């Protein structure tokens, strides 16, 4: 086997020729899904709450981007922080204190708001700390964390990529590329994707998100 075709060149002697060929025939998820790491507050007790701890009128649930969020004059916004194994949709329990005053504080704390140009955009999210990858649709309006990682594929490919990332095929690639207890954005970037039967996959994924 030519293990050099696998990013990082792991010695995975059990993989097939087809497994290795996908790295040259397919597109890397890093090129079409833009996996990103989000923010770490450095003080979760101060900045985070469960959504049901607050009055609904204090939470902005439909911000399009950072400027839209700040104009809303709301203090709290949906926050994706990973969570338990769950596919397709869910784990939307946290909110973050993210008005202008606290935005400026967070710029100087934790990991200084990396990838903030992507905050509030729809995408796909998964938990960094996990032994098995489970990916969910993340709608517009969410800030995301350093342990609730997020990818940003084009709208026409979002459902297909979500289906692929929740498949046994993708889990097999993750096992080879990232055999540890964490699934970081750099590992996801390396996974190859070959698109086929797109309409059928999109339909199945739509049903899974809905139900």
Residue ranges with predicted function:
Residues 207-211:
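Non-transmembrane amphipathic alpha-helical segments
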Residues 4, 12-13, 17-203:
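Polybasic, glycine- and aromatic-enriched phosphate-binding surface used to engage nucleic acids
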Residues 1:
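Conserved P-loop NTPase catalytic core
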